[in-house]
Amino acid sequence: MAGSEPTGLAPDDDRHLGAVLALAERSRREGHHPFAAAVVGADGRLLAEAMNDSRRDRTAHAEMNALRAAAEQHGEAALAGATLSSSAEPCAMCAGGAYWAGIGRVVYALSETSLLALTGSDPENPTLALPCREVFSRGQRPVAVIGPLREDEARRAHLGFWKEPSQPDLSQT
């Protein structure tokens, strides 16, 4: 595998991403949207993990839940330079949350473009065509982004979950 790893991939990134993908499958089995995320400290220690829970609160995305849990359990300082590992590319809201939480790196599996191909215009998952790299590029400090990784594996949690709507037209964005 040496030489084939994306630039910036830390030794434990793949292991943490695998755990997040398994948690996304569990999220689906428990009746939530099939997303999960984890916050990993700069020392490689798992600080928090979370599933999507947006049935009553559409902002309760896995990334936001993991960021909040990590801050509550370990203090805000623990998030400085930490890695957000996510089953899918963080949306604009979650990218903003990661930025303001002090996250230094984002590692994700399924790209926003691939997710959109799976969800189409399903009202359960309205998509903003705004990659997290673009959100982070507008900030005053850098956030490294690594992904997509393991997309085929990440896609499995979504297959058959979303309705079969027509694809939205994002050409005007």
Model region roles, listed by residue range:
Residues 1-27, 97-173:
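Zinc-dependent deaminase
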Residues 20, 24-27, 37, 48, ...:
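Small-residue (primarily alanine) positions within well-ordered alpha-helices
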Residues 35-44:
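Short beta-strand scaffold segments in enzyme catalytic cores
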Residues 47-54:
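Short beta->alpha transition motifs characteristic of CBS
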Residues 51, 60-63, 74, 80:
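Signature of N-terminal electron-transfer/Fe-S-associated modules in redox systems
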Residues 55-69:
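A short, polar/charged loop-to-alpha-helix boundary motif
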Residues 76-89:
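Immediate flanking context of iron-sulfur cluster ligation sites
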Residues 88, 92-96:
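Conserved redox-active cysteine motifs that mediate thiol-disulfide chemistry
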